[in-house]
From Swiss-Prot:
Purpose: Involved in cytokinesis and septation where it has a role in the localization of F-actin.
InterPro entries: AH/BAR_dom_sf (IPR027267), BAR_dom (IPR004148), BIN3/RVS161-like (IPR046982), Bin3_BAR (IPR037428)
Gene Ontology terms: cellular component: actin cytoskeleton; cytoplasm
PROSITE patterns: BAR
PANTHER family: BRIDGING INTEGRATOR 3 (PTHR47174:SF3)
A GO biological-process term: cell division
UniProt keyword list: Cell cycle, Cell division, Coiled coil, Cytoplasm, Cytoskeleton, Septation
Organism (species): Rattus norvegicus
Coiled coil: 16-57, 120-151
Protein's recorded name: Bridging integrator 3
C-alpha cells in the first residue's frame, strides 16, 4: 500500500527508513496479490461447480425427454436403449452432486473463510497509515519549535510537543512492528491452509471420474451391437438420411 506523502506539517527528519518502507510495501503487496488470487479462485471454483451441475441436470432432462418420445412406445429396442441411458444419466447426476457438495464443503467454503480475513488486515494497514500521519504531523511540530529561538514560552511548547509525540511514535512503531512480523507469517501460512483443500479437490475428482468410467463402461456394454463400428453407424445414418431426403414432402422444388 502506498500512502500519500505528507503535504502539510511534513517533518524534515525521515521518521521511517527507506528499508522499512520497502519491506512494508513488499509484504503488503504480496498479501494484496494473495487476496485477489483468493477471490478469483473462489469465483472460478463456484462457476465450475455450477457448470458441472447444469451439465448433469441437462443430461438427465435429455434422457427424460427421450423417454417421453413416441418411439419408445413403438420400438422396444429403442426403449431399452433410452432406459439404459436414463439410468446412467441419473447415476452420473447423483455422483456429480456428491462431488460438488464435497468441493463446496472442503474447497469453496475454506476459500471464503480465508478471504474474510483480508478486510481486517486491510483495516490494520489503514490504522498504521493513520498512525504514521499523526507521527509525521507531531514530529513536524516538534521540529518547528526546535528551530525557534529558545525562549521560555517556546521551550514550554517544545516540551509539550515532545510529550504529545512520544505516545504517538510508540503507537506507530508498535503497529508497524506487528504488521511487519505478522504479514509474512500470514502469507506463508497459505500453503498449510490450502493444501488439505486441494487434496480434497483432487480426491473428489478422482472418485467422480472413476465412477463415470464404470457408469459409461456399463452403458457401452448395454448399447454395443457386435459388428457395428462408428463408421458402420455413420454409413447407416447417411443411408437413412438419403431416404428421408428422397421423400416428396421434403424434395426441393
Amino acid at each position: 500500500m502506498s500512502w500519500i506523502p505528507f503535504k502539510i506539517g511534513q517533518p524534515k527528519k525521515q521518521i521511517v527508513s527507506k528499508t522499512v518502507e520497502r519491506d512494508f510495501e513488499r509484504e503488503y503487496g504480496k498479501l494484496q496479490q494473495l487476496e485477489e488470487q483468493t477471490k478469483r479462485l473462489q469465483k472460478d471454483m463456484k462457476k465450475s461447480t455450477d457448470a458441472d451441475l447444469a451439465m448433469s441436470k441437462s443430461a438427465v432432462k435429455i434422457s427424460l425427454d427421450l423417454l417421453s418420445n413416441p418411439l419408445c412406445e413403438q420400438d422396444q429396442d429403442f426403449l431399452r436403449m433410452v432406459t439404459a441411458l436414463d439410468t446412467a444419466m441419473k447415476r452420473m447426476d447423483a455422483f456429480n452432486q456428491e462431488k460438488v457438495n464435497q468441493i463446496q464443503k472442503t474447497v469453496i467454503e475454506p476459500l471464503k473463510k480465508f478471504g474474510s480475513i483480508f478486510p481486517s488486515l486491510n483495516m490494520a494497514v489503514k490504522r498504521r497509515e493513520q498512525a504514521l500521519q499523526d507521527y509525521g504531523r507531531l514530529q513536524a511540530k516538534v521540529e518547528k519549535y526546535e528551530e525557534k529561538e529558545k525562549t521560555g514560552p517556546v521551550l514550554a511548547k517544545l516540551h509539550q510537543a515532545r510529550e504529545e509525540l512520544r505516545p504517538v511514535r510508540e503507537d506507530f512503531e508498535a503497529k508497524n512492528k506487528q504488521l511487519l512480523d505478522e504479514m509474512p507469517r500470514f502469507y506463508n501460512s497459505r500453503l498449510d491452509y490450502f493444501q488439505p483443500s486441494f487434496e480434497s479437490l483432487i480426491r473428489a475428482q478422482v472418485i467422480y471420474y472413476s465412477e463415470m468410467h464404470k457408469i459409461f463402461g456399463d452403458l457401452t456394454q448395454q448399447l454395443d451391437q457386435p459388428g457395428h463400428s462408428d463408421e458402420h453407424r455413420e454409413r447407416e445414418n447417411e443411408t437413412k438420411l438419403s431416404e428421408l431426403r428422397a421423400l416428396s414432402i421434403v424434395a426441393d422444388d
